[in-house]
């Protein structure tokens, strides 16, 4: 039984491909659409030389692209690094260097900060940019627009042939917030974080779920719950809520910015069942 994050997500994708997986504003992605784009993103990383256990930074607010990238990174056998979008250049430089980051996904509005630190980070060679309506120049350091990267990648799920068997011992990395010093990377085995934070334990009984198909079987047998994590994806709570929803064939609603009135409208309009909220 391979309790690997990529496998667990793929089981749900296979069980409920036409169900809505992610909503952000007016954009919706089904599980099948998420799968295709995540496969493309994973292949793009692999084609650019990203190898197993390489670190890929996610420097974005909550949006569909960050979920595509999260899933694509684990499909590629790499490790995502959560990057606080409030960090200034010194903090970014430290985090990128400390994590040995080789690739980065960032929103366009952060291009000047990225341009300032890249010359000191020779390992960081691949930069993918998510359009956000800003006009900062990312071509100066070789950035590639997110949709262009997806267009270059294969949509196939052929990672077993490319990378070999996945393992429950693969690493999931969560960087702390850095409020009392520089952030620290906390390493989890995939199986452990699934059991503790990502829904792999029955909350009512405290018992581990039966097998890696338990959540996807439940997904196929039941209508979806709609989850709405409010904190930014840099926070472990929102990552946890998102992975739990993906594994269980449920729907995740995301919003890039917090606005109290908009949150209540979203809860009403999207018929949200479960709200995740932390101090930010």
Please identify what each model-predicted range represents.
Residues 47-48, 75-151:
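Structural core segment of the AMP-binding/adenylate-forming
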Residues 10, 18-63, 67, 71, ...:
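Conserved AMP-binding/adenylate-forming core of the ANL superfamily
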Residues 55, 61-81, 85-89, 97-103, ...:
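A short helix-loop-beta submotif of the ANL/AMP-binding
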Residues 1, 135-170:
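Flexible, low-complexity linker/hinge segments
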Residues 194-230, 234-274:
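Conserved AMP-binding/adenylation subdomain of ANL enzymes
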Residues 153-175, 182, 217-226:
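Conserved pre-ATP/AMP-binding loop-to-beta segment of ANL
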């Amino acid at each position: 039984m391979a309790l690997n994050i990529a496998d667990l997500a793929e089981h749900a994708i296979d069980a409920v491909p036409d169900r809505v997986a992610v909503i952000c504003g007016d954009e919706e992605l089904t599980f099948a659409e998420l799968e295709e784009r995540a496969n493309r993103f994973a292949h793009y990383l692999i084609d650019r030389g990203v190898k197993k256990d390489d670190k890929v930074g996610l420097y974005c607010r909550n949006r569909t692209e960050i979920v595509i990238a999260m899933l694509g990174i684990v499909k590629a056998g790499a490790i995502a690094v959560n990057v606080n979008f409030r960090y200034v250049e010194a903090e970014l430089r430290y985090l990128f260097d400390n994590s040995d980051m080789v690739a980065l996904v960032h929103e366009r509005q952060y291009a000047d900060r990225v341009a300032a630190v890249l010359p000191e980070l020779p390992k960081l060679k691949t930069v993918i940019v998510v359009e956000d309506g800003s006009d900062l120049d990312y071509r100066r350091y070789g950035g590639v627009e997110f949709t262009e990267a997806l267009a270059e990648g294969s949509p196939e799920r052929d990672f077993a042939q490319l990378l070999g068997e996945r393992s429950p011992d693969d690493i999931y990395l969560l960087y702390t917030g850095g409020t009392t010093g520089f952030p620290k990377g906390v390493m989890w085995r995939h199986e452990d974080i699934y059991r503790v934070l990502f829904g792999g334990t029955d909350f009512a009984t405290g018992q581990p779920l039966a097998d890696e198909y338990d959540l996807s079987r439940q997904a196929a047998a039941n209508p979806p719950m709609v989850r709405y994590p409010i904190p930014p994806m840099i926070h472990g709570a929102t990552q946890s809520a998102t992975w739990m929803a993906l594994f269980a064939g449920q729907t995740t609603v995301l919003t890039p910015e917090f606005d109290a009135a908009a949150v209540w409208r979203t809860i009403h309009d999207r018929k949200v069942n479960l709200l995740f909220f932390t101090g930010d």
